[in-house]
Swiss-Prot record:
Transmembrane segments: none
Biased composition (Polar residues): 142-152, 171-187
Gene source species: Caenorhabditis elegans
Name of the protein: Putative zinc finger protein C02F5.12
Keyword Nucleus applies: yes
InterPro entries recorded: Zinc_finger_domain (IPR053360), Znf_C2H2_type (IPR013087)
Zn finger spans (C2H2-type): 271-294
This protein's GO CC annotations: nucleus
Example of a GO MF term: DNA binding
Subcellular location: Nucleus
Length: 380
């Protein structure tokens, strides 16, 4: 069973609604009503009632007639004159009379029958019109049967416009195409909304990750900053060896090599050159000798590990073999404590040298590697 829904919008026109940006056809298609019919029907005001003067009634006195032709003329006159019903009939009709076949068949009545029939109608019709008010206006509002002056304008009935077959097919085609166009636009809009939501979520996630990374890096930088600040801090180290009193501007990143090199100057050991007979008391002087006497040669075999563990060769060209340039563990600890006893809390103990640990200068690359390792240890 097919049904339809009718919606009436009063006091508006389609043109006014379109000027306001409301297209009823598109709205209905958007909410899922592709088959719709929108039209504009005028509503005419109701016809005004025209008052006409009442027709004065024609006086008609009841007469006794016996001829059928007279009875027919009386009934015709009563139909033409009496346009309004009786207000009330209070007269009693008395008893019912049988059918008079004589009058109906047009037979000649007898004198006795005519006399009796003349007496009865008089008694029956007596008082029939006593309560009738011919001037009474019994019209009910809205039920007037007066014919207006222009019946064609008053009897207009709105009807659906009948379209030709070609126009109907064209209308259906345009409606289906517009409907499919609206569907594609809605689908594209939904896709755009989904893509925008995904982009917003991705941006929110990226910003959250960036904030977490920034806070983590801030904490790492704070910890590393304190460590770097302590490593870059400048300390004045004074040698406490009797009769020395030399002061060094020392930093943690310089390492202990320079301090050990100074402590070796207070021993009886000589460091020989491997290329000639030159001897000196520390590594710095040996490096200076290489720069002047052997500029094309690399300085090798004079590191911390070689001086402590005895890995370097003992005899050089022109060097007496009885001279021992190595430093024993006990002697190294004694020299270290005699020189830096008041700065042990900064420079630490000499145990690292004795155990053969290789202390190197903190270069930029090593510093970055160390920071990376510290950050990894902090994260895990």
């Amino acid at each position: 069973m097919s049904t339809y829904i009718q919606v009436n919008i009063y006091n508006q026109t389609l043109e006014v609604l379109k000027m306001r940006g409301l297209d009823l056809q598109s709205i209905l298609k958007t909410i899922g009503c592709p088959d719709s019919w929108v039209t504009e029907v005028p509503i005419h005001p109701p016809a005004q009632k025209i008052q006409k003067p009442a027709t004065p009634p024609t006086s008609c006195a009841p007469q006794l007639v016996s001829s059928p032709k007279c009875l027919e003329s009386i009934s015709a006159q009563s139909q033409n004159v009496l346009k309004k019903p009786f207000k009330s009939i209070s007269a009693e009709l008395g008893f019912a009379q049988p059918l008079n076949l004589v009058d109906t068949l047009g037979l000649k009545p007898r004198d006795s029958d005519a006399m009796s029939r003349g007496k009865r109608p008089a008694s029956v019709l007596k008082g029939l019109f006593d309560d009738w008010d011919p001037t009474a206006n019994l019209d009910i509002p809205g039920t007037s049967s007066d014919i207006p002056s222009d019946p064609s304008s008053a009897l207009k009935v709105p009807k659906k416009e009948v379209l030709d077959e070609s126009e109907e097919i064209l209308d259906q085609t345009s409606g289906s195409s517009s409907f499919s166009l609206n569907d594609s636009e809605q689908a594209n809009e939904q896709e755009r909304n989904i893509i925008e939501d995904l982009l917003r979520q991705q941006m929110f996630t990226e910003s959250k990750i960036k904030n977490e990374e920034a806070s983590l890096l801030k904490g790492l930088k704070k910890g590393l900053g304190e460590e770097l600040e302590s490593s870059h801090a400048n300390y004045v180290i004074t040698c406490n060896f009797p009769g020395c009193g030399l002061k060094y501007n020392w930093r943690v990143k310089y390492g202990k090599l320079r301090l050990l090199d100074h402590a070796l100057t207070h021993s009886n050991r000589k460091i020989p050159c491997k290329l000639c007979g030159f001897e000196c008391t520390n590594v710095r002087r040996m490096r200076s000798h290489y720069a002047k006497a052997h500029p094309n040669e690399r300085v090798e075999g004079y590191g911390m590990k070689a001086l402590v563990s005895g890995d370097s060769s003992r005899i050089g060209d022109g060097v007496d073999g009885d001279i021992d340039q190595q430093v024993s563990d006990d002697e190294l600890k004694e020299l270290w404590n005699n020189c830096f006893s008041e700065s042990i809390h900064l420079v630490g103990q000499a145990s690292g040298f004795v155990e053969g640990e290789k202390y190197r200068r903190m270069t930029k690359r090593r510093k970055l590697d160390r920071e990376a390792m510290n950050s990894m240890n902090f994260m895990f």
